Swiss-Prot record:
It comes from the Bacteria. One of its GO terms (molecular function) is ATP hydrolysis activity. Heterodimer of AddA and AddB/RexB. Belongs to the helicase family. AddA subfamily. The gene is addA. Transmembrane segments: none annotated. ATP binds at A60, S61, A62, G63, S64, G65, K66, T67. Residues 39-495 form the UvrD-like helicase ATP-binding domain. Keywords: ATP-binding, DNA damage, DNA repair, DNA-binding, Exonuclease, Helicase, Hydrolase, Isomerase, Nuclease, Nucleotide-binding. InterPro entries: AddA, DNA_helicase_UvrD-like_C, DNA_helicase_UvrD/REP, P-loop_NTPase, PDDEXK-like_dom_sf, PDDEXK_AddAB-type, Restrct_endonuc-II-like, UvrD-like_ATP-bd. Its cofactor is Mg(2+). This is ATP-dependent helicase/nuclease subunit A. The heterodimer acts as both an ATP-dependent DNA helicase and an ATP-dependent, dual-direction single-stranded exonuclease. Recognizes the chi site generating a DNA molecule suitable for the initiation of homologous recombination. The AddA nuclease domain is required for chi fragment generation; this subunit has the helicase and 3' -> 5' nuclease activities.
């Protein structure tokens, strides 16, 4: 129930419906099942919307309507009396939060329109008002709120900024690292530290590899819930644990034994083949068969009796025995067909070989790891101290501060837990452990609602851990009292052709070992409507492979590349779709794993006239030509004796010196000087004192004079003006901004130049000043191999989309092409010199000196890189995690398609005919084979090969060069232009006459309804005021009396470093303060200061607020006391929207605005509006805002059907607060 109080103190009660019981939910499901609605909710959706009172995990497959479920659940909570501000709703991105907020807003507006109950309308209106302040956003945004509000409890200032620019972070990191590195090199334990650095960098002078190690360890620790504890307790966990053969995990032993048994089984299958040749012509066993039988028997015996024969202590002996037993090669050949029977076992043996030697030397690396632990810990502390000093933090810092606040302050934690009715999380599969800890602290233990799909967890590079979702899934299924699992399987996005191929592929591919989830019936996609099941034969999925048997040389040689021929295949299919089926270009999307070859795709499409837009995201801003020219210009202004920058500026379009000009200038050296810079030669050339003044002709002399004069003016301006103004001066002086507008990609080039000025302005606002520091910052960014994000420009709508699979997540497209399916998965991380793991900590490759082991006496040392046991353990887990994520990437890519999916790759047709495995074992591809295959294409071909007797719902087709000729590819059909010769016969035709009549009628209608045409659909009171008010005076400008005109005066320049506070900012701050001010407490300076801390404004604005004037309003005016007396009737910052009729066009439009304050009583309403305008007579503001208050009153009357009896202006722009009744 909700209680409002009328003027007489009597309660007005809203009775809310209770939450549904399980029986009521079942009843609702039955009713929905037999309803007449065209689009019915599924039983699982209903269960997810209405189940309450416990933790809920919703496993929502692709296209299953999870956003719909979340919005409906939120609305149901509101309708049952849970205010929107009592829901914590976390989304993965800001964009997702915005879309969710808009959907909730639309639902609330719709509900208000349907509701006839007055009190319910009031309540829902309050929810609309609260929506903008509700906790709907990313975890980062919420953490910032917590730290801004309670940071003082852990010594963090509320006035901080976020370092979102990676370049700025790298510059600070480098400074901290360099200082700390010097300290460690001079400490007592320096020899161990030098050995550590050499182990990774080779020597102590080149520290780049060691620096990368430290940065990676730091970043990894930041994703944990407590970096300090992880570094102290988990960082060396595996190094301390795995020091003997007995310490090897049982799981690794099981994998080795499984590989041995699989090898025996596969070898038996091969020997049973008809063409194998078990017997000789004489009828006896062949030598090959005898040898293979021995291998089969011994491998089976060793697996069965492992504990008795070997045990963990004898593992090295087992490795030697197996190595001696099996052949060195991988294949067994039968009838010229090779079967890779021993390949997987060889890989496992390689992993375990030399274990005793490794363990012998592994203990020597432990002191090095302790030094690394100390260094990373010290780096973390020092880097944080610098950020605290700068009051600038990364997102992870803010999240850890929020966790610390909630952990260390029981009262704050409990206030949040008591406040939130439910803690809701979208995209739960992409959470990391830091975010999970924060959610746990906010929850009361039984009020979490989590939505996600582990099959779409693709953000491991952001330290997302799908096992968080997986563990919850298992826990809730095993122990229902902990929470409930709800599966949303129905897909409402894709046609059956897409659903069937997705199910066919992943039922053979995905399980707990690779993919992290068994793709069984409970995870398979089901069509959500009958329309999706209508078959279309031409929409069957296609695996189109360019036959590389006779590669024409167009394909790049690197493994990353996509060949010209592959792109041509795509272009051919798109032309066919567009010409034959009329598919618009915007319905087609190309998905790639990375953007490295986008230029090839764009170039090829341009050749065929196919419009294409990319998703952007490339970080090549500083490498764009126009930006490089400007940076060299700035470098030259900073130091003209920088020859590289000076030559670049001279050769640029701004001055256009050619090679001949530069050669003539270069010869103007001073014979007395050995080294002479180009700038000095230019100055000598101008005054004719160079070595060869005769080479400087009049034209060149004129160019030199212009350049030197311009450079001099720029250098002078750089000392006085801002960077922003300097850059625009350069643009204007040499017309460079206009010049790039005439070049290719003009819009992008101008956007880049404009962004350079803005970034320079942002740089100076962040506290850094001067051209030198700006250039130094840019150069450091380039030194660290970083760049700034490209500037986005508007893209054409009617074009094929090209984006990464990651970027496509959450989107859907009618036709999807998955390109470069032959690209090998990136396994770079598993070959690094170190691998990190959350449970095991760090594992490294140790550079051991085995001189003593070899008995070597002539050499100083014999260094061998060894994979330590922790490294091998982490490597295997990382390999499986990488393959799992790639498998989920393929799932995301395939499930974006609505109608048809294409796979594009290249392969050798002859080699692909080789059977990958001799026998199908169960429904899944064998684990060893899935680990071995390292491309999407290999997975698909293996499934097509091994499960060829099944309908896999996709076809494999090889494309030859002959299929990709210009004639075969075809051309886009463009609209046929009219033949001018045919027009002469139509001049007086009836068609032309009718057309002219229609044009005349349209012109007449346009003239009659001109006002309606130009009428906007949405307007605000301020716009209406501006439209009818003859004076255009911005807020904060003094109103000048008409009878007088102020005389011009001279004001001394203002040299304060503090930015001028805008009057509009003060007005916004006042409105925020009046909104959050607690009226239940006595209004005094302390109350106002406490409330001031909670508003979102900078310190300058807060200081500019006149708190004494606000205190005077509440204490000295009758209206201020009225606020405190009737605070239960008060509504503050209330949004509204009403329909109005334009007096000229008689057309309707929507009027929207926000009312500062109003008092709602049983039979009337009192309206209040605050104004900070400066004035001389109150009557002036009364006239100015009279119409605006009339609009507010009209909105309130329409909403509540009550008269507005009083309308007040609270004027805060004078010497004291004044109340004016309007």
């Amino acid at each position: 129930m909700l209680f409002n109080i009328n003027e007489k103190g009597e309660p007005l009660v809203i009775s809310f419906a209770p939450f549904l019981s399980p029986e009521a939910i079942k009843h609702l499901q039955e009713n929905e099942r037999y309803s007449d609605q065209s689009q019915k909710r599924t039983a699982q959706q209903i269960e997810a919307i209405y189940t309450s009172g416990q933790n809920i995990l919703v496993s929502a497959s692709a296209g299953s309507g999870k956003t719909f479920v979340m919005v409906e659940r939120i609305l149901d909570k509101i309708l049952r009396g849970v205010s929107i501000d009592r829901l914590f709703i976390s989304t993965f991105t800001v964009k997702a939060a915005t879309e969710l907020r808009e959907r909730i807003e639309n639902k609330l507006y719709s509900q208000i329109a349907q509701t006839t109950d007055f009190q319910m309308k009031v309540y829902l209106t309050e929810q609309l008002q609260s929506l903008c302040q509700a906790d709907i956003g990313t975890m980062d945004a919420f953490a910032q709120k917590v730290v801004s509000r309670y940071g003082y409890s852990i010594g963090i200032s509320s006035q901080f900024r976020i370092m979102q620019d990676k370049a700025e972070q790298d510059v600070l990191k480098q400074e901290v690292f360099s200082k700390l590195f010097s300290e460690f090199m001079n400490q007592k334990e320096a020899p161990a530290f030098r050995a550590l650095v050499k182990n990774f960098s080779g020597n102590c002078k080149d520290t780049s590899a060691f620096r990368e190690l430290v940065y990676t360890c730091y970043s990894f620790s930041q994703s944990t819930e407590n970096p300090k504890i992880w570094l102290q307790e988990n960082f060396l966990s595996a190094a301390k644990t795995y020091q003997r053969l007995e310490d090897i995990p049982d799981h690794d032993i099981e994998l080795l034994l499984l590989a041995m048994q699989d090898t025996a089984n596969q070898l038996r299958d091969v020997t049973d083949m008809e063409d194998y040749g078990q017997l000789t012509k004489a009828g006896s066993r062949s030598a090959k068969y005898t040898k293979h039988l021995t291998i089969i028997e011994k491998l089976s015996d060793w697996v069965r009796d492992f504990k008795c024969l070997y045990g963990k202590a004898g593992l090295d002996r087992l490795i030697r025995d197996v190595t001696d037993l099996i052949p060195s090669g991988n294949d067994v050949t039968v009838s010229k067909v090779k079967y890779p029977v021993f390949k997987t076992l060889h890989q496992k043996l390689k992993q375990f070989r030399h274990l005793e030697t490794i363990l012998m030397y592994q203990k020597d690396c432990f002191p090095l790891l302790e030094q690394l632990q100390d260094f990373v810990f010290a780096f973390s502390e020092a880097y944080l101290a610098v950020k605290i000093q700068e009051s600038a933090f990364e997102f992870s810092d803010i999240a850890h501060f929020a966790i610390k606040i909630l952990e260390e302050n029981t009262d704050i934690r409990q206030s949040y837990q008591q406040h939130y009715h439910e803690v809701m999380v979208d995209e739960y599969q992409d959470n990391n452990h830091m975010q999970e800890r924060l959610l746990t602290l906010l929850s009361n233990g039984h009020n979490r609602f989590m939505v996600g799909d582990i099959k779409q967890s693709i953000y491991r590079f952001r330290q997302a851990d799908p096992q968080i979702f997986n563990q919850k899934f298992r826990d809730y299924q095993k122990k229902p009292e902990q929470g409930k699992v709800i599966l949303l399987k129905e897909n409402f996005r894709s046609q059956s052709e897409v659903l069937n191929v997705s199910n066919a592929v992943f039922s053979h591919l995905m399980d707990e070992s690779v993919g992290d989830v068994l793709y069984d019936e409970q995870h398979q996609l089901i069509a959500g409507s009958h329309a999706q099941t209508v078959p279309y034969l031409d929409r069957r999925a296609q695996l189109l492979l360019y036959n590389s048997d006779k590669d024409d040389g167009n394909a790049p040689s690197d493994s990353e590349g996509i060949s010209f021929s592959e792109v041509t295949i795509v272009a051919k299919e798109i032309i066919k779709l567009h010409n034959d089926k009329g598919v618009p270009f915007e319905d087609i999307t190309l998905l790639v794993s990375s953007r490295t070859r986008n230029d090839i795709i764009s170039h090829t499409f341009n050749q065929y006239g196919i419009p294409i837009v990319t998703d952007g995201g490339q970080q090549n801003y500083l490498k764009s030509v126009e930006v490089m020219v400007m940076l060299d210009t700035l470098r030259t202004i900073n130091n003209p004796r920088n020859d590289y920058a000076l030559v670049a500026l001279l050769r640029s379009p701004m001055f256009a010196f050619d090679e001949d000009d530069l050669a003539r200038i270069a010869l103007q050296k001073d014979n007395e000087l050995d080294k002479d810079c180009l700038y000095d030669k230019m100055q000598r050339a101008v005054i004719g004192r160079g070595a060869h003044p005769e080479l400087i002709h009049d034209t060149l002399l004129g160019k030199l004079n212009v350049f030197l004069k311009t450079l001099k003016s720029w250098r002078r301006y750089a000392k006085l003006g801002s960077l922003y103004d300097l850059i625009w001066k350069i643009f204007n002086d040499r017309f460079y901004f206009d010049f790039v507008a005439s070049q290719a990609k003009a819009e992008q080039a101008q956007a880049n130049l404009y962004a350079l000025a803005l970034r320079a302005n942002q740089f100076e606002k962040s506290g850094y000043k001067g051209l030198y520091r700006f250039i130094k910052m840019i150069d450091k960014v380039l030194e660290t191999q970083n760049d700034l994000a490209d500037v986005e420009v508007a893209a054409p709508k009617q074009a094929v989309n090209l984006m990464t699979i990651h970027k496509s997540k959450g989107l859907q497209f009618p036709y999807v092409f998955i390109l470069n399916c032959d690209k090998r998965f990136s396994m770079t991380d598993i070959h690094k010199s170190f691998i990190l793991n959350r449970q095991h900590g760090i594992g490294i490759k140790y550079l051991a000196d085995i001189k003593g082991l070899l008995g070597e006496t002539t050499l100083n040392s014999v260094k061998v890189s060894m994979e330590t046991l922790p490294y091998q353990l982490n490597k295997q887990e990382l390999r499986l995690a990488t393959l799992s994520e790639q498998m989920r990437l393929l799932y995301v890519a395939m499930t974006r398609a609505e109608k048809k999916v294409y796979f594009i790759g290249k392969a050798s047709k002859s080699k692909s005919q080789e059977i990958t495995d001799p026998k199908k074992l169960g429904k899944l591809l064998p684990l060893a084979l899935r680990e071995q295959l390292l491309t999407f294409q290999d997975w698909l071909l293996a499934i097509a090969d091994i499960f060829s007797t099944e309908d896999l719902y996709f076809d494999v087709r090889f494309i030859e060069d002959s299929d990709l000729t210009q004639e075969s590819v075809g051309r886009l059909q463009t609209p046929q232009l009219l033949n001018p010769d045919d027009l002469k016969d139509n001049r007086q035709s009836e068609t032309i006459a009718r057309a002219l009549d229609m044009l005349e009628a349209v012109s007449q209608l346009n003239a009659n309804y001109e006002a309606a045409i130009h009428l906007p659909t949405v307007r605000t009171p301020s716009q209406l005021k501006a439209a009818y008010e003859p004076l255009l005076e911005p807020i904060g400008v003094d109103i000048i009396e008409k009878s007088s005109r102020s005389l011009s005066d001279f004001t001394l320049p203002h040299f304060s470093k503090k930015a001028k506070v805008e009057a509009s900012h003060i007005g916004s701050a006042l409105h925020q303060l009046m909104q959050v001010l607690p009226l239940s407490k006595p209004i005094n300076q302390q109350t106002l200061l406490d409330a001031l801390r909670g508003i979102d404004s900078n310190e300058e604005v807060k200081t500019a607020l006149d708190l004494k004037k606000i205190e005077s309003f509440f204490c000295d005016t009758s209206l201020g006391q009225f606020f405190q007396t009737y605070q239960k009737h008060l509504y503050r910052e209330a949004p509204f929207a009403i329909l109005k009729v334009d007096p000229i066009s008689q057309e309707e439009y929507v009027l929207r605005g926000i009312i500062d304050a109003y008092f709602l009583f049983d039979d009337h309403i009192v309206l209040v509006d605050y104004k900070t305008d400066k004035y001389k007579q109150p009557i002036e503001l009364k006239k100015r805002y009279q119409q605006q208050l009339e609009l507010y009153a009209e909105a309130l009357t329409q909403t509540y059907k009550l008269p507005v009896t009083k309308r007040y202006l609270v004027l805060m722009g004078g010497g004291k607060p004044e109340i004016v009744e309007v």
